[in-house]
Amino acid sequence: MVFSYEHYMNLLFHLDNSKETVPPEIAKRIISNAIAPVITVTSTPLFDKHIQETYKVDSLYMLLRFFGGCVSDRDQANEAKVGQHEHEVCDASDSTDSIPKNKNLEVPNLSKKGSRSRSNSLFQRDSTQSQYIRFTRPLGDLIETRDANDMLFNYHSLEVFLDNYLKLVAANTDEMVPHNLLKKSIYHSFFSLAISSTNNLSPYETFNHPILSLIALDISNGEVYEDARDLLVNFKNLNHNTENFPIFMNTNEMLPVFLLCYNDDSQEEFEKCQALAKKLKKQLFVESILLALWKDSFIYDENSVIQLHQPVMSSLEEILFFLQAPTQTTLSLALINSIYDMLDYLVYDLMIPFMKRKVSFWEETILQPRKSLFNGAKFFKKFMNKNPVNGNHQHNSLTRDSQGNEYFASSSSEFLMRKLADWSMMLSDFKTAYSTYESLMDDLDAFPKYLASCIEWCAVSLLMGAQSIVTVKMIKNDINPLIERALATYENCSRIQRGKGKESNSLDVTEPVRSYETRCMILASELFLSLSNTWTSTPYAIQYLETILDECKLGPCSQIMVWERLSDCYNLRVDPRIKHRVGAMKKDAKDTEDLRGEHKYSTDHFTDEDILSEGLTRRRKAAFFRLIAAKKWAEQKQWRQVSWCLKDIESTYSEIKFLHGNGLILSKLKNQLNLKDVDSAPRPSEKNLTRTSVSFIG
């Protein structure tokens, strides 16, 4: 089986890949997935009932969410495990009437599949070649459950997930499982949840705002044009009919697409779909996609059944739900490939062209006129933006909603420019994103919450778009000052919030801002670690991780994850001049054990260059932080993590005898570990490993 991005992020599914390696820029893949375009899925109760009866899934959304992630990877197909069955199914589908049927209409065309690259996104040289998507609930549901405090993520929920996830890791592994890559996968799962959400509608950025609304009809259940029209009208009128509809949302900026689902065994249903699609395009001006969601072979062909895994990116609430009630969902390989073909068309032929059209329109109508008028003269821009009358510029620009909150309206030039920058990030056009963020920053001086997020993503766009080596000068003069300014602005927001909320709990008041600040620092640290010159960039990552430990309100398990990441940072801090010598030195040390006395550590066989090499690493400091992490894991009763931490530092501390003395922390931890039966949890069989008990991991 080819090791993929999904395998790494869900490595507990794929422990047979635990000795693989991942590219250093893996963080860029995760961030691209975390800010991927969001698609809402709307279906009728009748449709959802049909789905539930056929595939044991609650709704169409719950079915399609399995297919979020990298579109080109098609990871749910799990081709290597089914072997020849995939080719048999694909050949059979080529002979059916579904292909010529769909050629008569602009719907997913299976023949397009060969024209698009399906290379593994994990190892692509240019990460921008991959397109990620995320699915979420209907927009009305998101608004009804929206948290009014604008919090990016919940610290407590993140801690609950991590605690249960680590217990699951302990139950499904033993001391013999290679753990180095698995521990990195665990950290990046934690990292992805701290920077991503599919249900948080932030007023300050648009990454989680839906871009496309997929409106589904069940032709097999007799749903017709009138049903489609009513669903579209309800969607378009959400801003009028929904209580507390956010003023920063606009359904007219979302692309509606009809998904017409039918039984592929019925020629009559297919013809109805064709006629309905033409009518919807002619009268409602909305595109349609046909999907053969039902077919006897999809249900009764047990030879090509695939068990689906949870998506890599999902909301924290959904992950916790599947943690408490893990489920197994299976689909036939033919249906899985049909859904991926539909998504290919949806993403590449409808969504991305729509986004590019909107970006071009905003550039021509908002961005270019501003550049032409001021031509980069920041002094004049600041002068024009100032309101000379009593400094009321902020109140004139912001709009108050029904709950008394003040935000930029969806039609304001500031918010549209922010959307232009965010959509450029989603399309991997980092140059346009950076220039737009930079242009917008001067307009947001009076709005610190908006300004902080804008500065943060200006820095992220620089790091994400860095295809060549980022120089020390660029980090020192451009990138790090942006991050420091963003953090200072977030801190200013916290002070303002504390001043407004003197009568309430100050922690409750500042937590929403702190969640953004935490996200900023954890993003910066991972992107610095993804740079090629780790000797230069690692100190910046260390600085932000230490600040997270000092200032952010993380739970104990979350804090220990950061302690371990600090250890990883020091492991990476190797002078580039002697990187090749470190590995050679270690091998030489192993080959010369006979030169060492039984109680004496002799260094006579090392050359001067070896000693120099040993001095230009931070291995001992890395081991020290790992030892701290082991102590803290022991306090949380996470004995598998304690065992792995002690294994990691064994080679570093084996020659330092005094550290093993009675009463010292190392010997205490070993004694505690010996008293615990870390392998007491039942071991799953190789075939059933993680599939039954880890199906919720995202």
Swiss-Prot record:
GO biological process, one term: endoplasmic reticulum to Golgi vesicle-mediated transport
Superkingdom as given in the UniProt entry: Eukaryota
Basic and acidic residues bias (residue ranges): 678-689
InterPro entries in UniProt: TRAPP_III_complex_Trs85
Keywords: Autophagy, Meiosis, Sporulation, Transport
Pfam families: TRAPPC-Trs85 (PF12739)
Main location: other
A GO CC annotation given for this chain: phagophore assembly site
Positions of region (Disordered): 82-125, 678-698
Localization terms from the record: Preautophagosomal structure
Assembly and oligomerization: Part of the multisubunit TRAPP (transport protein particle) III complex composed of BET3, BET5, TRS20, TRS23, TRS31, TRS33 and TRS85.
Family: Belongs to the TRS85 family.
Function of the protein: Specific subunit of the TRAPP III complex that acts as an autophagy-specific guanine nucleotide exchange factor (GEF) for YPT1. TRS85 directs the TRAPP III complex to the phagophore assembly site (PAS) that is involved in autophagosome formation. Required for membrane expansion during autophagy and the CVT pathway. Required for sporulation. Has a role late in meiosis following DNA replication.
Additional detail: Present with 8760 molecules/cell in log phase SD medium.
Designated name of the protein: Trafficking protein particle complex III-specific subunit 85
Taxonomic source organism: Saccharomyces cerevisiae (strain ATCC 204508 / S288c) (Baker's yeast)
